[in-house]
C-alpha cells in the first residue's frame, strides 16, 4: 500500500505515484551540491565569482583514435589488398593473390618426352611449392614510417627506369604469346606441340588419368596464351542431353507442312518437340533452349507457334512494348470508365422516358371524354399504347422503371406498389428492410454504465 515511509499512497485506487519524503530530500540535496559546485545557489542567487570556479569537464576521448603509430591510410590499403599509389598494377596483384586459388596452373609445365619413342607419354613437372606467404612488399603496403618513427622519403623513378620496365614487360608479353602459339589442342582434344621437330610431332592419345584431364580443362579455361578449339559435335550432344530443344525457325529448316502442323498440334509438350527434332533434323541451324513460360506469348487461340512468332518481336518485348502495354492499359481503363458513365446516364434517361411514357398514356386515358361511340376505339388505343410500352421494356429499348440499383424509400415503394409497374416481390423486400430500419431507430440505447 505504501512505498518506504511515504505520506501519500503510492499504489492506491486513483492516485498518482508520487515522490516520497526521502526522494524529495535527496532531490534537494542534489540541487544544493550542484549549485555549490557551479558557484551559485538557487536559494541565495549568488553570482558566479569567476570561470575558474566552474566544475571541470571530462577530458576528450579522441586520443584513442591515434593510438597506432602508423599512416592513417595503411590499414585501408590492407583491406583493399593493394595500394593505389604504388607501382604495382591491379592485374599483377590479382595474379599474385589468385595464384594459390587456381591450383597454381602457371607452375605446371607440360613437356613432351624427348626419348623419341613415340609412345606419347606426357610428363608433368610439379615442383613442391612452399606455402605462399603474402608480404607487404608485394601488395605495396609498406608503412610510411620506418622503425625510428620518422616518415620515409618516397623515391621518384626517372623516365629511363620507367622506359626500361616497359620494355621488359613487352618482352615478357611477346614470349608468352609465342609460347601460346607453339602449344594448342586440336579438335580431338589431343595435345600437339607445333614448335617441336617433325620427328616428334604426332597426335597423342588423351591420357586416362582423370586428375590430368581436370588440370588440362582448367588450363584451357583460365591459363593465358593457350588456344582451344571446341568440337561442334560435343557441343551439340551436350545441348541434346542437358535441355529440351525447340526448333522455331521454320523458314530456314527442312520441315514439310505436315511436320509444322504436328509441331503446332503439340506446341505445349516440349518432349514431343525435342523427340521430333532428334528424329527429323540432323543438326539445327541455331539451337535455342525454350521453356514453357517463354512459349506463352506464341500460344494464341487458333494460331500455332509459327503465326505467333510472326506477330511477336523478341527484341523489344521487355523494353519498348512494356511501356506501350502500360499506356494501352490506362487508355482501356479510361474508355471502360467512360463507357460505364455513359451507360449509367443512358439508363437514367431511359428510366425517365419510361416514366413519362406511362404517365402520358394514363393521363391521355383520363382526359379523354367517355362517349359510347368512341369507347371501343379508346380501349383499342389504350391497349395499343400499353402493349407498345411493354414491348419497349421487354426488348430493353427503354429501361423498366422498377429495375433500379438503389434502395427506395417506403413512400416511393408504396406509390409504385399502387401503380402497376412495380412487382410484388420487390415491394415486399424493400418493405421489410424499411421496417427493420424504423424499428432499429426507435429502440432505446443501453446505457454504458449504471446510474448511481
Swiss-Prot record:
One of its GO terms (cellular component) is nucleus. Keywords: Cytoplasm, Nucleus. It is found in: Cytoplasm; Nucleus. The keyword Nucleus applies. Its main location: cytoplasm. This is Uncharacterized protein C1805.14. It comes from Schizosaccharomyces pombe (strain 972 / ATCC 24843).
